[in-house]
């Protein structure tokens, strides 16, 4: 680990940046950040964190320790959960949406006839290539009940029931075959949190269904996303839009248009920089009320 810290400090010394941004950089030590700050008192250090932080979610203690580990040297923290909904207090913490990128989100599923009705994918850890034996996830119970209730719906499901998770190009190939996508994250819903799957579902033009308890209605209307209250409501809406494909595709197209316009990586990065350096931006940040 000393070798890594030296490499980081050498890179810092070579470039002397005004800003260092870390994302899930667990191996960087507080001492390394302290040394950087000692080199340059005006240096800004920020972190972003995309994992769940709710006390009702998975890995709560571990994720909390990770985000607070170097907090004394962090000027700003950007989270994909509303900081006000958390029981962790972090100075200068702000919400950011999961960014999309038009060079990655390239599909327009609303323009075609898909062979599957509903897509859902999960895993037992970020980019973990295979299922963990004996590992259970609450989502499996929900999805299996959902499938049982809707025998006429064609599901394409990965990461459970002995079907391995999918990543990268394989993920894109599979997602291209579905009309609707279920966005269901681990743990109980919490304000604004979603895994980054939301960007892939909406951004690729799937009609996306999400729990209303995420409060994403603050940014999207019923003409852009489909919000459900419980399993029965989700079943009703899946069947409704499975029959009314014209309306479903219009909603999917409007959702993609908004996500690519307001939640793209350029706009999200600009928001971060504008808040870090207190600079006014010409962009509209629909998720920020300040």
Model-identified regions with their sequence ranges:
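Conserved acidic donor-binding segment of nucleotide-sugar-dependent glycosyltransferases
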Residues: 225-231, 240-245
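Generic anion/oxyanion-binding catalytic loop in active/binding sites
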Residues: 163, 190, 223, 244, ...
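Surface-exposed amphipathic alpha-helices with a cationic face
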Residues: 33-41, 147
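C-terminal amphipathic helix plus adjacent low-complexity
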Residues: 237-290
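Nucleotide-sugar donor-binding catalytic core of glycosyltransferases
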Residues: 3-7, 11-15, 23-31, 56-58, ...
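A short, histidine- and acid-enriched strand-loop-helix "catalytic/donor-clamping" loop
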Residues: 46-60
């Amino acid at each position: 680990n000393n070798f890594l810290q030296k490499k980081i400090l050498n890179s810092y010394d070579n470039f002397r940046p005004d800003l260092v941004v870390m994302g899930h950089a667990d191996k960087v030590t507080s001492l390394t950040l302290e040394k950087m700050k000692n080199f340059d008192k005006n240096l800004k250090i920020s972190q972003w964190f995309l994992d769940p932080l709710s006390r009702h979610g998975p890995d709560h203690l571990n994720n909390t320790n990770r985000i607070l580990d170097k907090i004394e040297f962090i000027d700003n923290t950007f989270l994909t959960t509303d900081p006000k909904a958390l029981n962790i207090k972090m100075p200068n913490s702000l919400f950011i949406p999961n960014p999309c990128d038009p060079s990655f989100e390239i599909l327009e599923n609303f323009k075609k006839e898909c062979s599957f009705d509903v897509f859902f994918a999960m895993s037992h850890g970020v980019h973990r290539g295979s299922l963990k034996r004996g590992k259970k996830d609450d989502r499996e119970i929900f999805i299996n009940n959902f499938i049982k209730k809707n025998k006429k719906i064609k599901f394409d499901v990965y990461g459970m029931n002995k079907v391995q998770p999918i990543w990268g190009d394989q993920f894109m190939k599979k997602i291209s075959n579905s009309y609707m996508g279920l966005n269901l994250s681990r743990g109980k819903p919490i304000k604004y949190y979603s895994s980054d799957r939301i960007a892939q579902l909406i951004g690729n033009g799937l009609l996306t269904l999400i729990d209303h308890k995420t409060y994403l209605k603050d940014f999207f209307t019923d003409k852009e996303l489909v919000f459900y209250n419980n399993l029965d409501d989700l079943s009703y809406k899946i069947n409704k839009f499975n029959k009314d494909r014209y309306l479903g595709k219009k909603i999917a197209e409007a959702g993609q248009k908004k996500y690519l316009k307001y939640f793209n990586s350029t706009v999200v990065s600009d928001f971060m920089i504008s808040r870090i350096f207190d600079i006014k931006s010409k962009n509209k940040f629909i998720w920020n009320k300040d």
